């Protein structure tokens, strides 16, 4: 495994972050395809054994059970100081409504720490932009969470570049803890972030940790092949349903290059993303140990300039999606 500094922090993180939305009791939350604790622990242990030290969960994943599972597994399989644990706040969980008001943030971090069984998280991220709360209120509350020692750093996720720029400016002007990461929607078939968000992050020294690096599985298998999760993934359909014809052309080239190199489609798609300036650690998901191992090995795959161009040439502008 390779490691890289997470933006302007002192954290050294693995080049892959294990996304933990897959982990959670299936009868809790909105996803019936999540893995129960016993199966989840096998994946988390394999990740740690494979050198992954960066884990991303959220208060809302499976009604909080993802945090519970991740916390127990990390305590059993690693020392706390050896791992970087990130969680999020915004979406509704239990009787805690959606939002980023000061009371919601302060209660949410306490609930997350209780579920994780930890004194602090390394990274607390706002899951989305809250249009119903003044951003100043949100940013000051996040700063107080950092000052209280409950989160070492804060990050953001999926918002418009002008919103992120405004937040960074307000943090500087008020001496508040800055956003050090941007968790955004970025992969071979969705590259709209290259227009404004990625240059902004690069200029400000903000680490990019993309979600859906494999387009929710679309870049891992023959185009058009379905899975149970793909069929039931209503959010995923909102991301890619309008651009399938163009995306299929990119997937064809991906398959050709993967076959030519003797590696998998997923490994090529991750290698492409890992080569992008500012991208520190794509957030991967896995439901089987062999699947995770395949992704871990992607870190050692390199692409030539010609292969990069071959993958990128068919891309056409997409509707901006993923902010809700």
Positions of PLM-derived features:
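N-terminal binding-site loop/beta-alpha segment at the start of enzyme catalytic domains
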Residues: 1-83
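Conserved beta-strand positions
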Residues: 18, 57, 87, 123-126, ...
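Acidic-and-aromatic substrate-binding clefts and catalytic sites of carbohydrate-active enzymes
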Residues: 58-67, 92-93, 130-134, 161-162, ...
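Acidic (Asp/Glu)-rich catalytic clusters
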Residues: 73-82, 114-117, 146, 168-174
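Active-site groove signature of glycoside hydrolases
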Residues: 114-133
